[in-house]
From Swiss-Prot:
Pfam family, one: GDE_C
GO biological process: glycogen biosynthetic process; glycogen catabolic process
Protein's job: Multifunctional enzyme acting as 1,4-alpha-D-glucan:1,4-alpha-D-glucan 4-alpha-D-glycosyltransferase and amylo-1,6-glucosidase in glycogen degradation.
PTM annotation: Ubiquitinated.
Molecular function terms, GO-annotated: 4-alpha-glucanotransferase activity; amylo-alpha-1,6-glucosidase activity
Keyword Thylakoid: no
UniProt keyword annotations, A-Z: Cytoplasm, Glycogen biosynthesis, Glycosidase, Glycosyltransferase, Hydrolase, Multifunctional enzyme, Phosphoprotein, Transferase, Ubl conjugation
Active-site residues from the entry: 527, 530, 628
Protein name from the UniProt record: Glycogen debranching enzyme
Family per record: Belongs to the glycogen debranching enzyme family.
Length: 1533
C-alpha cells in the first residue's frame, strides 16, 4: 500500500478480445500487462501502437513490449510488461501466442486540459460547458459581448456549432465549404479569418479561463457545396454506387407524384394538396400501389431477360464442341447473378451450372427443346422470387413514406407543414437532381450516362434502429430502396471508401478541415458520431491530435447499446459522451442518471494504488439540455429550469447546457431556421430589454452559483455521490469528499408539471442531514415578477422576462428563508444528525448545504488518518496529530508486531472454528449470512478482498459494522485475551478502534478496512521476513503459498506433539494458564482445515511428513521441522511411525508408509538445513522403547536419532507382525477383524518393502468401506498390499542415503543385523540398495513389448509403457492399475528409472490423469473409475456408497506436485526442446493453483476436487500437503 504511483494491471487471457470493453486511464498512470492463468508459461508477446517516448503516434505502427520479472524467478505469476502513459488518445494492444493472435483491445488515456494565464489544469469533472449556435453570434466583432454572458454565468467551456460557410438550408450542420470561415461573420469593410478566431479562442483561454471546442462534421456536405460537383466521386452517386439506381427511380417517381398532388391532379382520387386525415393517407397508399409501382417495374433491376438467357442456353447446347460436364456439384444450384451495373433485366445466371443441371438425353432437337423449356421454367421461377422480394421492399417503402407524411403533416408533435408544394414535397427527396425538369423516361436514360449519372447523389440522414457499424449507403443495404432513411435533403452523404487512396480528394479535404479546427480549438465534438465511418474518424482524430495532443473529444452516440458505444469510445478515444437529462421522464429518473454518470458511493473503501484495471463506463458530459433537444419549458415548465440544472450540476462528471436555457427562452432554438442573434451582457439592462441580459435575467444568477460549485466539487475531490429521492418531486444529491469528510447536499424541488396548473403539496417531508451544517451555500427560488409578458423578439433570441430567481449565497442556517427550523437529533452516541423543516421550498426551488462531521467525529477521523499514514500516504490529507492519544499509538504498528513469532502469527491471522473452540472461542458470525472462515484477520480480509474492489457497501458484512461495534470489539478482544505480543497487537487495534467508534456509522466500513489492511499487510511482511530467502525473494505466488506454513503450523491450548527430550536446550516454552507451570509448546502441522485441525485428529504421521519439506524446510522453519521429526521419532513402535498421532498415547500404527516419509524428511532436513546432519545426534525421548512398554514420560529413555533410524530399518528387514492394540470397534468401527493384523517386511530377493493384507489399507489411499447397504463395510477400496510403488521408491531413497552416510562414517551402521531361522544374518545397505536397483524396472515397468518374459500376468495388462502401482498385490489386477503414485518414486529415487521409459509413463499420466488442479487417482479407462466423491451418498452401488471411490478417480492435489517435479527432472534429460515445453506445462498448471489460492476465502489449496477440477464439498478447503508439494515444485523451478 505504500507507494503512491497509480498502477493498473490488465490480465491477458487466451482468446479474450476486449474491443468492446472500455479501459480508461489517466496520464501519469502505469499500465501493467500480466499473464492470466491460461497464458502462463507460454511464449506471449504483447504489441501496442502506444508510441515510444519521443516518437509520434502512428496507428499502424506496433512494437513489442519487454517482459519484466521483478523476482527473476521462473514462475510467471509476477511477470509483466508496462506502459508509462504520458499521451492522450486511443491506443490498441494485442498479444501473440507464438505467431498467433490471441486477443487484444484498446485503452483510452484522458487528455489534460489547461486553462488560464498560468496554464492550470482543468479536471474533466470540473467542465461546465455551454453550446452556442455560432450563426446566432452575429458579426465577429460583436462575439465578445455575446460570449461574455457565458463567462458571467460561470461556464468554463464553450461549444461552438460549425463556424464554416453554411449551405442553402442555413442549417448549422450543413456546410458548403469546410475550409472557409462563414462570411456572415465579416463586415463589408472587414473580412475576418481563422487567425482572428484563433486569437479570440486564445484570449478566452488566457483571460477568461474558458476553453473552446467546435463540431467536426464528417458524414455529409451541403448539397450546394461547390467542391462536391468538382469531385462527384466523393458522394454516393449512380456511377460509383449503381446499386442505388432502383432507389433513385423510385425517388423520382415519388417526386413526380408529389408535384402532381401539389397541382391537384389527384384530388378526384381522394388526395388534395392539403392532407388532413387517415382516409387521404389510405388513398395515397392505393395510388402508389396502383399507379406508381406498376409504371416503374422496379423488379426488373433484379431479374434476368428470359428470352435472351434461353437463346444463349440453346446456343451452348447445340455447340458441337461444348465440353461435356460431368455430374454437377450438388451444392451449386442455379441462382441469379446480380448485374453490377443494375440495368433492367441485366442479371444473368451461371451457364456452366445450367448446362450441368439441365442435360438433354440425346442431341435431337426435341430433347434440346425440352431441356430449354425446363431451363425457361427455372428462370421464370427465379424471376418470380425476385419480384416477390421487391414487393416486400415496396411494402416497407409505402409504410415508411406514410409514416413520414403522418409525422410532417398530421402528428401533434410534428412540424405540420401544410399543403404539399414543391418547397415542401410529399416526402423528402433522397437524391440530388441538378438538371431541368424532364419526363420520367428521359430521366431514366440519364442513369446510364456516366457524365450525368455522377451528379445524381444520395442525401444523408439517419436510420432508426440501424447497426451504426454498417454503412447504410453501401451495396448490400436496401435502406434507400425501402425508404427507411430519415433524410436530410440539404446534405449529400460522403463516400470515403476504406482508405485515403479510395477517394484522395475527399480524405485530403477533410484532413485539412480537421487541421484548421485542431489548430484553433482545444477540442472537438464529433457530430453524428454513430454514423461516421469509424476508420475515417480515427484517421481525422489522429491528424487533430498531432496538432493538439490533449484534444478534448466529445460525442453523442445513439447506438442504443453500451457495447456499441464502447466500440466508438475506445477506437476514437472519446473523452466524454454527451448524456441528456431531458431523456428523464421524471425527477426519479433524473436522480438515477446523476448516480449512473459519475462518482462512487459515499463511504466507499479506499482502493490501493496498485489494482486491477476495471472496465469503465464512458466519462459523461451531462447536459441539462442539448441544442437538439426540444424546449424543456414546453415539455416540463419554466419553473423546472433551476432545480433540474442544479441536479445535473451535482453529478460527479462534466456538466453542460445550451445558450437560451438560462434565459428561459420558451421555444427550441432551431439549428436550421433561427436567424436572430443572442443577447449581449449588460449589468444595467432592465428585464424588459430583449437584446441584453444580466444577473436579473432568467436563472443566470443561480447558474453562476451552481457552476462555481460544480467546479469546486470537482477540483477538491468531492468524488462520492449519494442520491436520495425524498418524494415524487424532491431530489437530494450529496457530494462527499473522502479526504476531508465534508459534504455538499443539494435539495431540489423539481417542477416537471407547471405549478400554475398542477397541484403540488404544501407539506414537504422533513430531511435528516448527518453532521453539522456549516452554511447554506445557495438558496434560490424561481419566482414571477411584474413586468411585461414574453413576446418573441424579431432581432434577439429573448427569454421570459416575467420569471426570475431570487438567490442568496453563503448564509447561516438561521438566515435561511427556505428552512423553517433546524433541530439536532442524535442517533446513537456518535451520530450527529440535523433535522430540517422546510417552508417556502416551492416547486422550482433549491437549497444547498455545506455539511461537516460534528466536531468530535471530525477530530476522531483526523486522528485515525494521522495513524493510517504509516501504511499509506493517501491519508495525509485531513489527518490530525494530537498529543493526548493512547501511548501505544505513538509506537509504529510495525515495531510492535515485529516481535511476533510465526506461531503467534498463526493465532493473529488464522485459526479456524475448531482450533478457536479449543481456546473457548469461535469464529465471528455475521447474522443472516455466515461465519468467517478464520477467527484471525485473514477471516475478515478474505471478505473485504471480495467487497472492496466492488465497493459493495450493501454487503451484510458492512451492515453488521454499521449496526454496532460487535465485530470491532471481537477483533481486538480476541487478541487482548492472549498473552505477550499478541495482546500488544490487540491493544494497538483497540486504541485505533476507540476513534473508529467515534465517527459516523456510514464511514466505519471504510476506516475499519483501512486499519485492518494496514495491519494485515504489515503482519504478512513480518511473516515473510522470518522465512527463507527463497520466500523473501520469491514471487507473489510463492509468498502466498508460504503463508500455508503459518496457517497449518501452530500450537493449540493442548500441545498435539508428545514432549521432546528435556536435554534439548532450544525448545519453545510457555506458562500453562491453568497450572501456571512452564510447559513445552512445539508447533505441529494440521493435516487440513477445517476437518483435521484440532484435538486428536489434528496430527497425522503421513500427512505431516509429506507436507514437512514444503511447509517447513523450503520456508526456512528449521527448528519447527526438527522438533516435529524428533517428536514423531519418539513414538516409533514396531519399527513404524504412527499414522494418527493422538499425542502419542492414542497413536495407531496402521500405516506402512509414514515411517518412509519420516525418513525422507530426515534426509531432506540434512540436505537443506545448514549443519543439518547434527539432527542425527539429537536426543529422542522414546515413548515406547519396547513394543509393549507403557508410554514413558519425556527424558526417561533418550537415544540419538541415528539409533532410532537404524531400529526402523532393522525391524523392516526382520519383518513386522503384530495386532493393533484395542482392536475392534472402539478404535475403528468399520474394520473387519483381519484388518487389525499388521504386517510389513523386506523381500529377500528384490529388496522391496512389502506388507498389508486385503482387509487393511496401509498407504495414503486408505478408504475403508462403511456402507451396509452396498455391502462394502470393512472392505478397503484400495488395499494396495504387496509392494506399493511409492514405498519402494521412498525406501530406495532412504537406503541409498544411509549407504552414502555410512561410507562417510557419518552414520555408524553399514548394515542391518537380523535373526532368521534362529541365526543372525546381516544385510548390508550396499546390497539392499543394489537389489532394489536391479529389480525395480524389471518388475514394475509394463513393457511396450507384449512378449516381455518378465511379465507375470500379460492378460491383466491394459496400458503399456506405464509403471505398476504395486507389485505382488493379493488381487494381481490391482498391480496393473494406472495411478499417479509412481511419480513419487521418480522424484525421490530417479535412479530407478530409465529416462526414456520414465518419460513415456509421464506422458501417459499427463494425458490420462492430470486434471486442472489435481491428479486423477485412477485411470479413467478403469471400470471402477468414478471422479465424483460424495461421502453422504448411501445407496446400493458397491463402488460409490459412502464415498468408497475416495481414491478411485477424484483428483487429489498433492500428487500433482510430484508429477510436475518428475516431469521437470526427466525433461532436462530429454533435451532442451522437451525441457522448454515442460516448463510451459508446469507454469500453466501452477497458474491454476495460483488462481485458486487467490480466490479461496481460506487462502489455501484443497485436499481434492471432483473430476475436471469441479468443487468437492467433502474435501478439506485447505490441505497441508497440497500447499506443500506445489511450493516444492516452485522451489524446483
Amino acid at each position: 500500500m505504500g507507494h503512491s504511483k497509480q498502477i493498473r494491471t490488465l490480465l491477458l487471457n487466451e482468446m479474450e478480445k476486449l474491443e468492446k470493453t472500455l479501459f480508461r486511464l489517466e496520464q501519469g498512470f502505469e499500465l501493467q500487462f500480466r499473464l492470466g492463468p491460461t497464458l502462463q508459461g507460454k511464449a506471449v508477446t504483447v504489441y501496442t501502437n502506444y508510441p515510444f517516448p519521443g516518437e509520434t503516434f502512428n496507428r499502424e505502427k506496433f512494437h513489442s513490449l519487454q517482459w519484466e520479472n521483478p523476482t527473476e524467478r521462473e514462475d510467471d505469476s509476477d511477470k509483466y510488461c508496462k506502459l508509462n502513459l504520458q499521451q492522450a488518445g486511443s491506443f490498441q494492444y494485442y498479444f501473440l501466442q507464438g505467431n498467433e493472435k490471441s486477443g487484444g483491445g484498446y485503452i483510452v488515456v484522458d487528455p489534460i486540459l489547461r486553462v488560464g494565464a498560468d496554464n492550470h489544469v482543468l479536471p474533466l469533472d470540473c467542465v461546465t460547458l455551454q453550446t452556442f449556435l455560432t450563426k446566432c453570434l452575429g458579426p465577429f466583432d460583436e462575439w465578445e459581448s455575446r460570449l461574455r454572458v457565458a463567462k458571467e454565468s460561470g461556464y468554463n467551456m464553450i461549444h461552438f456549432t460549425p463556424l464554416q460557410t453554411l449551405g442553402l438550408s442555413r442549417s448549422s450542420y450543413s456546410l458548403a465549404d469546410q475550409l472557409e470561415l462563414n462570411p456572415d461573420f465579416s463586415r463589408p469593410n472587414k473580412k475576418y479569418t481563422w487567425h482572428d478566431v484563433g486569437q479570440l479562442v486564445e484570449k478566452l483561454k488566457k483571460e477568461w479561463d474558458i476553453l473552446c471546442i467546435t463540431d467536426v462534421v464528417y458524414n455529409h456536405t451541403a448539397a450546394n457545396s461547390k467542391w462536391i460537383h468538382e469531385h462527384p466521386e466523393s458522394a454516393y452517386n449512380l456511377v460509383n454506387s449503381p446499386h442505388l439506381k432502383p432507389a433513385w427511380v423510385l425517388d423520382r417517381a415519388l417526386w413526380h407524384l408529389s408535384c402532381d398532388v401539389a397541382e391537384g391532379k389527384y384530388r378526384e382520387k381522394g388526395v388534395p394538396a392539403l392532407i388532413e386525415n387517415d382516409h387521404q393517407m389510405n388513398c395515397i397508399r392505393k395510388i402508389i400501389w396502383e399507379d406508381i409501382y406498376p409504371k416503374i417495374h422496379l423488379w426488373e433491376f433484379f431479374q434476368v431477360d428470359v428470352h435472351k438467357a434461353v437463346e444463349q442456353f440453346r446456343g451452348l447446347l447445340t455447340q458441337e464442341n461444348r465440353k461435356i460436364i460431368s455430374q454437377p456439384d450438388p451444392k451449386q444450384h442455379l441462382k441469379i447473378i446480380q448485374d453490377p451495373e443494375y440495368r433492367r433485366l441485366g442479371c444473368t445466371v451461371d451457364m456452366n451450372i445450367a448446362l450441368a443441371t439441365f442435360i438433354p438425353h440425346d442431341n435431337g432437337p426435341a430433347a434440346i427443346d425440352e431441356c430449354c423449356n425446363w431451363f425457361r421454367k427455372r428462370i421464370e421461377e427465379l424471376n418470380a422470387e425476385k419480384h416477390q422480394l421487391v414487393n416486400y421492399h415496396q411494402e416497407q417503402a409505402v409504410n415508411c413514406l406514410l409514416g413520414n407524411v403522418f409525422y410532417e403533416r398530421l402528428a401533434g408533435h410534428g412540424p405540420k407543414l401544410g399543403p404539399v408544394t414543391r418547397k415542401h414535397p410529399l416526402v423528402t427527396r433522397y437524391f440530388t437532381f441538378p438538371f431541368e425538369e424532364m419526363t420520367p423516361s428521359t430521366e431514366e436514360s440519364m442513369i446510364h450516362l456516366p457524365n450525368k449519372a455522377c451528379f445524381l447523389m444520395a442525401h444523408n440522414g439517419w436510420v432508426m434502429g440501424d447497426d451504426p457499424l454498417r454503412n447504410f449507403a453501401e451495396p448490400g443495404s436496401d435502406v434507400y430502396l425501402r425508404r427507411e432513411l430519415i433524410c436530410w435533403g440539404d446534405s449529400v452523404k460522403l463516400r470515403y471508401g476504406n482508405k485515403p487512396e479510395d477517394c484522395p480528394y475527399l480524405w485530403a479535404h477533410m484532413k485539412k478541415y480537421t487541421e484548421i479546427t485542431a489548430t484553433h480549438f482545444q477540442g472537438v465534438r464529433l457530430d453524428n458520431c454513430h454514423s461516421t465511418p469509424i476508420h475515417v474518424a480515427e484517421y481525422m482524430l489522429d491528424a487533430a491530435r498531432k496538432l493538439q495532443p490533449n484534444l478534448y473529444v466529445v460525442a453523442e452516440l445513439f447506438t442504443g447499446s453500451e457495447d456499441l458505444d464502447n466500440i466508438f469510445v475506445t477506437r476514437l478515444g472519446i473523452s466524454s459522451l454527451i448524456r441528456e437529462a431531458m431523456s428523464a421522464a421524471d425527477s426519479h429518473e433524473e436522480g438515477r442518471l446523476v448516480y449512473r454518470y459519475g462518482g462512487e458511493p459515499v463511504g466507499s473503501f479506499v482502493q490501493p494504488c496498485l489494482r486491477p484495471l476495471m472496465p469503465a463506463i464512458a466519462h459523461a458530459l451531462f447536459m441539462d439540455i442539448t441544442h437538439d433537444n426540444e424546449c424543456p419549458i414546453v415539455h416540463r415548465s419554466a419553473y423546472d429550469a433551476l432545480p433540474s440544472s442544479t441536479i445535473v450540476s451535482m453529478a460527479s462528471c462534466a456538466s453542460g447546457s445550451t445558450k437560451g436555457y438560462d434565459e428561459l427562452v420558451p421555444h427550441q432554438i432551431s439549428v436550421v431556421s433561427e436567424e436572430r442573434f443572442y443577447t449581449k451582457w449588460n449589468p444595467e439592462a432592465l428585464p424588459s430589454n430583449t437584446g441584453e441580459v444580466n444577473f436579473q435575467s432568467g436563472i443566470i444568477a443561480a447558474r453562476r452559483a451552481i457552476n462555481k460549485l460544480h467546479q469546486e466539487l470537482g477540483a477538491k475531490g468531492f468524488i462520492q455521490v449519494y442520491v436520495d429521492q425524498v418524494d415524487q418531486d424532491i431530489v437530494a444529491v450529496t457530494r462527499h469528499s473522502p479526504s476531508i469528510h465534508q459534504s455538499v447536499v443539494s435539495v431540489s424541488r423539481t417542477a416537471f408539471r407547471n405549478p400554475k396548473t398542477s397541484f403540488y403539496s404544501k407539506e414537504v417531508p422533513h430531511m435528516y442531514i448527518p453532521g453539522k451544517i456549516e452554511e447554506v451555500v445557495l438558496e434560490a427560488r424561481t419566482i414571477e415578477r411584474h413586468t411585461i409578458p414574453y413576446k418573441k423578439d424579431e432581432n434577439s433570441i429573448n427569454g421570459m422576462p416575467d420569471i426570475t430567481v431570487e438567490i442568496r449565497e453563503h448564509i447561516q442556517l438561521n438566515e435561511s428563508k427556505i428552512v423553517k427550523h433546524a433541530g439536532i437529533v442524535t442517533k446513537g452516541p456518535n451520530e450527529f444528525v440535523q433535522e430540517i423543516e422546510f417552508e417556502n421550498l416551492t416547486p422550482g426551488s433549491v437549497i444547498i448545504f455545506r455539511v461537516s462531521l460534528d466536531p468530535h467525529a471530525q477530530v476522531a477521523v483526523g486522528i485515525l488518518r494521522n495513524h493510517l499514514t504509516q501504511f499509506s500516504p493517501h491519508f495525509k490529507s485531513g489527518s490530525l496529530a494530537v498529543d493526548n492519544a493512547d501511548p501505544i499509538l505513538k509506537i509504529p504498528f510495525a515495531s510492535i508486531a515485529s516481535k511476533l513469532t510465526l506461531a503467534e502469527l498463526n493465532q493473529v491471522l488464522y485459526r479456524c472454528e475448531s482450533e478457536e473452540q479449543e481456546d473457548g472461542g469461535g469464529c465471528y458470525n455475521i447474522p443472516n449470512w455466515s461465519s468467517l472462515k478464520y477467527a484471525g484477520l485473514q477471516g475478515l480480509m478474505s471478505i473485504l478482498a471480495e467487497i472492496r474492489p466492488r465497493n459493495d457497501l450493501g454487503h451484510p458484512f458492512c451492515d453488521n459494522l454499521r449496526s454496532g461495534d460487535w465485530m470491532i470489539d471481537y477483533v481486538s478482544s480476541r487478541l487482548i485475551s492472549r498473552s505477550g505480543t499478541i495482546a500488544e497487537v490487540g491493544k494497538w487495534l483497540q486504541a485505533m478502534f476507540l476513534y473508529l467508534k467515534q465517527i459516523p456509522r456510514y464511514l466505519i466500513p471504510c476506516y475499519f478496512d483501512a486499519i485492518l489492511i494496514g495491519a494485515y499487510t504489515t503482519l504478512l511482511d513480518i511473516a515473510w521476513k522470518q522465512m527463507s530467502s527463497f520466500v523473501q525473494n520469491g514471487s507473489t505466488f510463492v509468498k502466498h503459498l508460504s503463508l500455508g506454513s503459518v496457517q497449518m503450523c501452530g500450537v493449540g491450548k493442548f500441545p498435539s506433539l508428545p514432549l521432546l527430550s528435556p536435554s534439548l536446550t532450544d525448545l519453545p516454552y510457555r506458562v500453562n494458564e491453568i497450572t501456571k507451570e512452564k510447559e513445552q509448546c512445539c508447533g505441529s502441522l494440521a493435516a487440513g482445515l477445517p476437518h483435521f485441525s484440532a484435538g486428536i485428529f489434528r496430527c497425522w504421521g503421513r500427512d505431516t511428513f509429506i507436507a514437512l519439506r514444503g511447509l517447513l524446510l523450503v520456508t526456512g522453519r528449521y527448528l519447527e521441522a526438527r522438533n516435529i521429526i524428533l517428536a514423531f521419532a519418539g513414538t516409533l513402535r514396531h519399527g513404524l511411525i504412527p499414522n494418527l498421532l493422538g499425542e502419542g498415547t492414542h497413536a495407531r500404527y496402521n500405516c506402512r508408509d509414514a515411517v518412509w516419509w519420516w525418513l525422507q524428511c530426515i534426509q531432506d532436513y540434512c540436505k537443506i538445513v545448514p549443519n543439518g546432519l547434527d539432527i542425527l545426534r539429537c536426543p529422542v525421548s522414546r515413548m515406547y522403547p519396547t513394543d509393549d512398554s507403557v508410554p514413558l514420560s519425556a527424558g526417561t529413555v533418550d537415544q540419538p536419532l541415528f539409533e532410532v533410524i537404524q531400529e526402523a530399518m532393522q525391524r523392516h528387514v526382520q519383518g513386522i507382525q503384530f495386532r493393533e492394540r484395542n482392536a475392534g470397534p472402539q478404535i475403528d468401527r468399520n474394520m473387519k477383524d483381519e484388518g487389525f493384523n499388521i504386517t510389513a517386511g523386506v523381500d529377500e530377493e528384490t529388496g522391496f518393502v512389502y506388507g498389508g493384507n486385503r482387509f487393511n489399507c496401509g498407504t495414503w489411499m486408505d478408504k475403508m468401506g462403511e456402507s451396509d447397504r452396498a455391502r462394502n463395510r470393512g472392505i478397503p477400496a484400495t488395499p494396495r498390499d504387496g509392494s506399493a510403488v511409492e514405498i519402494v521408491g521412498l525406501s530406495k531413497s532412504a537406503v541409498r542415503w544411509l549407504l552414502e552416510l555410512s561410507r562417510k562414517n557419518i552414520f555408524p551402521y553399514h548394515e542391518v543385523r537380523v535373526k532368521r531361522h534362529g541365526k543372525f544374518v546381516t544385510v548390508s545397505y550396499d546390497e539392499w540398495n543394489r537389489k532394489i536397483q536391479d529389480n525395480f524396472e524389471k518388475l514394475f515397468h509394463v513393457s511396450e513389448d507384449p512378449s516381455d518374459f518378465n511379465e507375470k500376468h500379460p492378460e491383466l495388462v491394459h496400458k503399456r509403457g506405464i509403471y505398476k502401482d504395486s507389485y505382488g498385490a493379493s488381487s494381481p489386477w490391482c498391480d496393473y492399475q494406472l495411478r499417479p503414485n509412481f511419480t513419487i518414486a521418480m522424484v525421490v529415487a530417479p535412479e530407478l528409472f530409465t529416462p526414456e521409459k520414465a518419460w513415456k509413463a509421464l506422458e501417459i499420466a499427463e494425458k490420462k490423469l492430470l486434471g486442472p488442479l489435481g491428479m486423477k487417482t485412477l485411470d479413467p479407462d478403469d471400470m471402477v473409475y468414478c471422479g465424483i466423491y460424495d461421502n453422504a451418498l448411501d445407496n446400493d452401488n458397491y463402488n460409490l456408497a459412502k464415498g468408497f471411490n475416495y481414491h478411485q478417480g477424484p483428483e487429489w492435489l498433492w500428487p500433482t506436485g510430484y508429477f510436475l517435479r518428475a516431469k521437470l527432472y526427466f525433461s532436462k534429460l530429454m533435451g532442451p526442446e522437451t525441457n522448454a515445453k515442460t516448463m510451459f506445462l508446469v507454469k500453466n498448471v501452477l497458474s491454476r493453483h495460483y488462481v485458486h489460492l487467490e480466490r479461496s476465502p481460506w487462502k489455501g489449496l484443497p485436499e481434492l476436487t471432483n473430476e475436471n477440477g469441479q468443487y468437492c464439498p467433502f474435501s478439506c478447503e485447505t490441505q497441508a500437503w497440497s500447499i506443500a508439494t506445489v511450493l516444492e515444485t516452485l522451489y524446483d523451478l
